[in-house]
C-alpha cells in the first residue's frame, strides 16, 4: 500500500503538526533518546484484508487497506498523561478533517477513507504515542490477473469455422458425429 499520498495530504492539511509527518521507517527507527519536535505523526501500514472473488465468470475482489497514524504528543509536564490525552483529543479533529471521506486519485480505484478506531501504544514521562486507524478499499479485477496476460498474448479474433451436427431425436437423441452443414464467419 502506497502511503506517500496520505503523508503528503496530512502535511498539507494539518498545520498544527508543522509538516511533521513521516512513514514506517522513521517510526521503526525512533528511539527513547531521539526526541522529535511534537506533535509529530507517523503513517504506517497495518494490514490488507481481501474479500472473496465477487464474480462468477470474471475477477473482482475488494481489498481493505488499513493504515495507522501514530501521533506523538509531549507528556513531559504531566506524568499522569492527562495533558497529553487532552492534546491528543484536540488534534484528532484536524486529522479527521484531513482524511475522512477523502478519495485518493484516481478516484475510481480507491474508496473514501474511513476511521476504524484508535488505541494507546505507549506512554512514558516524555511522550504519549497513540495510534488512530483508518482504512480505504482498492479493487482487483481481470486486468490484475495472469488470465489477462494470457488473453493479451492471443492473436486477434478474425473469424471461425462452424460445423453443424444435427441431433437425431428418433434414433439416439444425440448428434451422430457427421456434420450436416459447415459455414465460416470472418470479422473484418
Walk through the language-model features, giving the residues of each.
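A solvent-exposed acidic/polar surface segment
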Residues: 34, 42, 90-94
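Short amphipathic alpha-helical patches
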Residues: 33-40, 118-123
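A short, hydrophobic beta-strand-centered structural micro-motif
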Residues: 36-51
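Short N-terminal edge-element motif at the start of the domain
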Residues: 24-35
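Charged, amphipathic alpha-helical segments and their flanking helix caps
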Residues: 1-26, 47-188
Amino acid at each position: 500500500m502506497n502511503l506517500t499520498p496520505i503523508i503528503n495530504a496530512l502535511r498539507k492539511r494539518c498545520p498544527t503538526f508543522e509538516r511533521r509527518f513521516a512513514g514506517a521507517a522513521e517510526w521503526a527507527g525512533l528511539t527513547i533518546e531521539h526526541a522529535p519536535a511534537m506533535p509529530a505523526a507517523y503513517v504506517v501500514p497495518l494490514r490488507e484484508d481481501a474479500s472473496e472473488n465477487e464474480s462468477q465468470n470474471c475477477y473482482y475482489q475488494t481489498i481493505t487497506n488499513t493504515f495507522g497514524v501514530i501521533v506523538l504528543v509531549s507528556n513531559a509536564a504531566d506524568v499522569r498523561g492527562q495533558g497529553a490525552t487532552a492534546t491528543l483529543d484536540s488534534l484528532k479533529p484536524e486529522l479527521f478533517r484531513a482524511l475522512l471521506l477523502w478519495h485518493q486519485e484516481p478516484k475510481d480505484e480507491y474508496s473514501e477513507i474511513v476511521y476504524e478506531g484508535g488505541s494507546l501504544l505507549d506512554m512514558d514521562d516524555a511522550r504519549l504515542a497513540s495510534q488512530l486507524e483508518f482504512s480505504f478499499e482498492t479493487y482487483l479485477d481481470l486486468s490484475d490477473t495472469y488470465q489477462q496476460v494470457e488473453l493479451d498474448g492471443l492473436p486477434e479474433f478474425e473469424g471461425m469455422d462452424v460445423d453443424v451436427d444435427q441431433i437425431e431425436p428418433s434414433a439416439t437423441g444425440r448428434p451422430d458425429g457427421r456434420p450436416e452443414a459447415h459455414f465460416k464467419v470472418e470479422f473484418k
